[in-house]
């Protein structure tokens, strides 16, 4: 039996894609006969999760172990306890799967693997996107030359979520590692859990309307995901303002964790555009509530400046919702080719026009939604095959 260790800084929902992808991949690998353990910390933004530290927890056949982490510096998630566990126990595993970069957990895991001769896979999860690398560029450049260059040179493989993410990382890999030393690169699609394809619970739908009665009888324009700088929330605010002025039935529904204080900024932008009363902020929803929201929506919108995969896009399509996404979401080619939605430049006028087109043509919207479901179902099957390949790397 293959013994796999996955190392991720945190599984808190506020951190988006990796916190969803890691457990999903772990469960898939267990179903294929592997033994999977996940090392992570209890860090959750400025605070900490109340989790059982030092006591393994078994879920879906996966063993999770939580270690105390520091909340400062917030982005680094320093954890001496995690480092000690990696040093003393990593040799018991056949391969280690390391999530993200520029972060303590990844650095400690790669170092421990090299020290004990254990092969490891690096999974940047979008951190090599040129748009994101421009943020804190000097700090990241120093970290790359001091630490990440060695981490990548000694990796058994580098994993990407989409072919587009791999393409965007090629120049960086060749420069920082050297074209002769670049490890194997594989695309391992994240996929969507089966429950997203299930019909929405009527009770969850009723509960949502009871909590937010202003949604009754409206066409829901849905943003579903982290309220983050890269999500294009300024574009969304301007685009929705244009739509709302011409369509009194349009109502913006914003769902997801506010990790960077962008909820207040979005409120300000909507207030300045005089459409704040046509928006509802529903916060973080559980699985059933999320399916109820997406299942009853008119259109899903994600005008991101950068998106290495777009987990929320895939989940919306699994629920049969047509999507409007920017051409910087790495799923954009698949969405356009399948006719599952509209792909537009990352600017407000084009986004508004696409939203209006879908709201005006319900038959076309339903057809897009069905094509999206088929696209995601097919991608889920391919993701399973890719995960099996990742287990053999």
Question: What do these predicted ranges mean?
Answer:
Residues 42-45, 192-193, 224, 251-265, ...:
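Glycosyltransferase donor-sugar binding loop
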Residues 5, 159, 214-231, 237-240, ...:
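Conserved donor-binding/catalytic core segment of Leloir-type glycosyltransferases
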Residues 40, 144-206, 214-216, 282:
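Donor nucleotide-sugar binding/catalytic pocket of nucleotide-sugar-dependent glycosyltransferases
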Residues 337, 341-349, 357-362:
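Conserved acidic donor-binding segment of nucleotide-sugar-dependent glycosyltransferases
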Residues 90, 152, 284-285, 292-297:
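Short alpha-helical donor nucleotide-sugar binding micro-motif in glycosyltransferases
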Residues 305:
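Aromatic "clamp/platform" in nucleotide-sugar-dependent glycosyltransferases that forms part
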Residues 322-326:
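Short hydrophobic beta-strand element within catalytic cores of glycosyltransferases
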Residues 264-288:
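Nucleotide-activated donor-binding/catalytic signature segment of Leloir-type glycosyltransferases, i.e.
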């Amino acid at each position: 039996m293959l013994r796999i260790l996955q190392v991720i800084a945190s599984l808190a929902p506020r951190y988006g894609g990796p916190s969803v992808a890691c457990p999903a991949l772990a469960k898939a690998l267990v179903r294929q006969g592997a033994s999977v353990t996940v090392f992570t910390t209890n860090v959750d933004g400025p605070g900490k999760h109340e989790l059982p530290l030092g006591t393994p927890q078994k879920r879906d056949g996966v063993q999770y172990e939580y270690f105390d982490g520091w909340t400062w510096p917030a982005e680094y998630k320093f954890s001496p306890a995690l480092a000690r566990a990696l040093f003393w126990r990593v040799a018991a595993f056949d391969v280690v799967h390391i999530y993200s970069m520029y972060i303590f957990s990844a650095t400690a895991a790669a170092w421990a693997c090299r020290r004990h001769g254990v092969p490891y896979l690096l999974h940047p999860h979008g951190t090599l996107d040129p748009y994101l690398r421009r943020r804190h560029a000097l700090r990241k450049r120093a970290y790359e030359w001091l630490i990440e260059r060695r981490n990548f040179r000694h990796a058994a493989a580098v994993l990407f979520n989409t072919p587009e993410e791999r393409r965007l990382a090629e120049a960086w890999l060749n420069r920082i590692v050297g074209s002769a030393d670049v490890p194997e690169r594989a695309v391992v699609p994240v996929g969507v859990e089966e429950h997203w394809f299930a019909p929405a619970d009527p009770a969850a739908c009723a509960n949502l309307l009871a909590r937010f009665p202003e949604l009754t009888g409206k066409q829901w324009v849905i943003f579903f995901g982290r309220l983050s700088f890269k999500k294009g929330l300024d574009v969304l605010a301007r685009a929705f303002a244009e739509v709302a002025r011409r369509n009194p039935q349009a109502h913006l529904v914003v769902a997801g964790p506010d990790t960077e204080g962008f909820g207040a900024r979005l409120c300000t932008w909507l207030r300045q555009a005089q459409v704040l009363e046509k928006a509802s902020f529903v916060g973080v929803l559980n699985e059933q509530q999320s399916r109820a929201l997406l299942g009853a929506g008119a259109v899903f919108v994600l005008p991101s400046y950068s998106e290495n995969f777009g987990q929320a896009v895939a989940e919306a399509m699994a629920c049969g919702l047509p999507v409007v996404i920017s051409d910087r979401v790495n799923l954009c080619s698949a969405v356009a080719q399948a006719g599952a939605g509209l792909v537009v430049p990352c600017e407000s006028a084009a986004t508004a026009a696409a939203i209006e087109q879908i709201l005006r043509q319900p038959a076309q919207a339903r057809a897009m939604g069905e094509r999206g479901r088929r696209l995601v179902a097919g991608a889920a099957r391919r993701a399973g095959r890719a995960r099996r390949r990742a287990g053999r790397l």
